[in-house]
């Protein structure tokens, strides 16, 4: 490993990358000037630098209760109308569903999470395909399903899609990739002498789906809404009533939030820098009490397709410290919820319990065992199982 931290030496190290690694980085939209600039920023006191980089400026305040709408309740006249509006949009080809599938199940043996069995002998990927098949059958047309993969998951997922004979409207696109640096800003090399690559966070989705051409083609064909969620949150399925509510709203992005329970940590909606936006706790002003906000982000978003395609978005790159081969390293990541800073956002509180639950994430084997009955009940109630 080199300790030189000047941009010139990092640039020279990047020049020396193998052709194979360069090709992989290029395919994943690697931004060389950005990494060189970020490396050069690794100076001064670490805590001060991270506070300056990560925390929003100015004051923050909790949203009012009127700014968090409840999800449409089943059985009401209003919900029936919204459901009809949403179903009509799906039948007209106006919806695409995106699943973020770049993660490895590090607490489940380090395998590709999409290929982990979730319930009833079916993997997360198989359940997402089954969900899409049911939705497409009801709509009377294929509903586009796009899977954002990472360098680690792309090939296994594409092989699984081939093996499962996934329909042509199921596509994959590759999220971004970058290289880890030393704490001083030099290119980190592992015990094998090779650079250490990493995925750069789910905030990559916007640039990645633009780069893929899928979004542009979808918009040209009349697509209007992109629904985005995590692979492992099987509760986050397409709800026509929520879609209808978003269609009727003036917002460009709708965020699904749910009530906090003990132990929950995640981004929360707050007023900051002139926007009601989702911020992780490390981004909040030091004097802001996160407990004053009783809901948090489920990482499920509905976004206007044209805004997702064309809106100018200035991304923050967040400094994350990791350890590789026993050495401290720095990697830079983006967060998808920054959409709520760039686009006008609205928030909908969704249930997290019962067959209507929309927040059922799975992070480890114990949670999978605990959640399996809830997942099964939710999917059965929606006609997926």
Question: Language-model segments: which ranges?
Answer:
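Solvent-exposed, flexible loop/coil residues
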Residues: 112, 119-122, 183, 213, ...
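N-terminal glycine-rich phosphate-binding loop and ensuing alpha1 helix
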Residues: 3-171, 179, 188-198, 202-206, ...
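Catalytic core of tubulin tyrosine ligase-like
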Residues: 218-230, 235-239, 244-385
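A general secondary-structure junction signal
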Residues: 149, 174-176, 349-351
